[in-house]
């Protein structure tokens, strides 16, 4: 499949993505990055749930690439040798063997729970990214809103919703305050690390979901 253009991000993309929360009685919504003909063109096969999730993740990855480009252009964080020290102060979601998402020991149900839980944990970090960009402010918002939609899509696919852990709002609020109180260098480094880790998490998720 072709990759999406980052120009697809914007207020219109937000609205289209949020249409997914409307009742099923309404016509099938067009996801950000989708062509309407993929959804409702006469005499054509609509995208399956798995295909829509796949396409949606690649759309978000496109947005992350655009945000990383701005981050790298405005600072030297992408080449910094001090990032390991800063990363130790974050608790960004990562895939591990026990999560069942790798080819060895793959477990669909366990992996899906990990993906959804990880995305929910990333939400506070995506909130932190808001107002961290000047020329890509709308893209940062699009990544955040598109991730919320992705979580909804995956929750419909999950069989064991009770196993999904949702972060405590008070914990997230405290973490957000702490991140925003950092000095400028640490804020820039945190932005870089969040984008890099989120990209890696989504790429691992995409590979696992293609096995389901």
Curated annotation (Swiss-Prot):
Leader sequence segment: 1-29
BP GO terms, sorted: acute-phase response; glucose homeostasis; hepatocyte proliferation; interleukin-6-mediated signaling pathway; liver regeneration; positive regulation of multicellular organismal process; positive regulation of receptor signaling pathway via JAK-STAT; positive regulation of receptor signaling pathway via STAT
Subcellular location: Secreted
Major subcellular location class: secreted
SMART domains xrefs: IL6
Cellular component GO terms, alphabetical: extracellular space; interleukin-6 receptor complex
Cystine connections: 72-78, 101-111
Matching InterPro entries: 4_helix_cytokine-like_core, IL-6-like, IL-6/GCSF/MGF, IL6/GCSF/MGF_CS
Keywords for this protein: Acute phase, Cytokine, Disulfide bond, Glycoprotein, Growth factor, Secreted, Signal
Residue positions the entry lists as glycosylated: 73, 172
Gene3D superfamilies in UniProt: 1.20.1250.10
Entry's Gene Ontology molecular function annotations: cytokine activity; growth factor activity; interleukin-6 receptor binding
Family: Belongs to the IL-6 superfamily.
Assembly: Component of a hexamer of two molecules each of IL6, IL6R and IL6ST; first binds to IL6R to associate with the signaling subunit IL6ST. Interacts with IL6R (via the N-terminal ectodomain); this interaction may be affected by IL6R-binding with SORL1, hence decreasing IL6 cis signaling. Interacts with SORL1 (via the N-terminal ectodomain); this interaction leads to IL6 internalization and lysosomal degradation. May form a trimeric complex with the soluble SORL1 ectodomain and soluble IL6R receptor; this interaction might stabilize circulating IL6, hence promoting IL6 trans signaling.
Role according to the record: Cytokine with a wide variety of biological functions in immunity, tissue regeneration, and metabolism. Binds to IL6R, then the complex associates to the signaling subunit IL6ST/gp130 to trigger the intracellular IL6-signaling pathway. The interaction with the membrane-bound IL6R and IL6ST stimulates 'classic signaling', whereas the binding of IL6 and soluble IL6R to IL6ST stimulates 'trans-signaling'. Alternatively, 'cluster signaling' occurs when membrane-bound IL6:IL6R complexes on transmitter cells activate IL6ST receptors on neighboring receiver cells. IL6 is a potent inducer of the acute phase response. Rapid production of IL6 contributes to host defense during infection and tissue injury, but excessive IL6 synthesis is involved in disease pathology. In the innate immune response, is synthesized by myeloid cells, such as macrophages and dendritic cells, upon recognition of pathogens through toll-like receptors (TLRs) at the site of infection or tissue injury. In the adaptive immune response, is required for the differentiation of B cells into immunoglobulin-secreting cells.
Protein name: Interleukin-6
Organism: Cercocebus atys
